[in-house]
Structure formats: structure tokens, C-alpha cells
């Protein structure tokens, strides 16, 4: 029960961070780089590592860290989708190389865990439902 509660809190934190970052970038003209940094921090927290350190790794190494740390498959989907959304923000912030790395990291995670990434990273409609299903 404790593990399920922890997982639900983690998934809801991801959903909230993604939704808030999207809303702030869209509605409040927040710096897209700051939004990307926020998502990267949430990813690091989910794995128990500094986000900047984790995401400085190659895509294959990020997958290795997730596998070694035993990260829950539901969480890995949120991580991959957060990285994909982060790449959109980094593109807006004219950080092309870093945006490409985030896309590669997201795809590597998706490939390793059998995740279908959305065409539109900003479409969060199914994430809340997914988080609620994890709690069921």
C-alpha cells in the first residue's frame, strides 16, 4: 500500500509539473528554458538523482540508470514524456543540441520500455487518466 501511495504521488507530481510548465509557457510567457529545467529536475527527483547529472548522460546510459534503479514502468513513461516536452521547450529557447539530446533520451526510454510516445508532446490529456489508473 505504501509503495502504491508513493507511486501515485510521484505520477501526480509529474502530471502537475508537466501541466504547470505547459500552462506557464503558453499563458504566462515563461522562459521556455526555465520550463525545461523544471521538468528535468522532476525527472531527476523521480530517479533519486540530480536531474542535470542524469540528463547529461547518453540516451543509453539514462536507460541503464533507470533499469539499475528499478524505476517503475509507469514512471518511465512519465519520464520519457517529460523529456519529450522538455525538448519542445528547449527548441523554443533555441537550444537545438540539448533539445535533440532530450528527444534521443525520450526515444531510448520509450524503446527500452515499449512506450508509444505521442506525436504532440504538449498533449497531456491521457496522462491524468494514466496516473489515476496506477492508483486503482
Give the positions of each predicted feature.
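N-terminal alpha-helical interaction modules that lie
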Residues: 1-76, 130-136
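Hydrophobic/aromatic side-chain positions at a characteristic register within alpha-helices
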Residues: 6, 25-27, 84, 90-91, ...
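Structural register within alpha-helical repeat arrays
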Residues: 13-14, 20-21, 79, 86-89, ...
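The tetratricopeptide repeat
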Residues: 16, 75-78, 82, 119-127
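TPR/TPR-like (Sel1-like) alpha-helical repeat modules
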Residues: 32, 36-47, 97-115
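Boundary/linker segments of alpha-helical solenoid repeat arrays
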Residues: 47-52, 112-124
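Short acidic, glycine/proline-enriched loop segments that cap or flank alpha-helices
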Residues: 70-75, 89-98, 116-118
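TPR/TPR-like alpha-solenoid repeats
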Residues: 82, 89, 127-134
Amino acid at each position: 500500500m505504501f509503495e502504491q501511495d508513493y507511486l501515485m504521488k510521484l505520477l501526480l507530481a509529474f502530471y502537475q509539473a508537466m501541466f504547470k510548465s505547459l500552462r506557464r509557457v503558453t499563458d504566462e510567457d515563461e522562459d521556455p528554458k526555465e520550463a525545461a529545467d523544471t521538468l528535468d529536475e522532476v525527472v531527476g527527483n523521480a530517479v533519486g538523482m540530480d536531474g542535470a547529472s542524469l540528463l547529461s548522460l547518453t540516451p543509453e546510459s539514462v536507460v541503464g540508470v533507470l533499469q539499475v534503479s528499478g524505476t517503475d514502468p509507469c514512471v518511465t513513461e512519465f519520464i520519457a514524456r517529460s523529456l519529450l516536452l522538455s525538448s519542445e521547450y528547449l527548441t523554443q529557447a533555441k537550444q537545438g543540441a540539448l533539445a535533440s539530446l532530450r528527444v534521443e533520451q525520450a526515444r531510448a526510454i520509450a524503446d527500452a520500455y515499449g512506450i508509444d510516445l505521442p506525436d504532440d508532446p504538449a498533449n497531456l490529456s491521457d496522462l491524468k487518466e494514466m496516473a489515476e489508473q496506477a492508483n486503482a
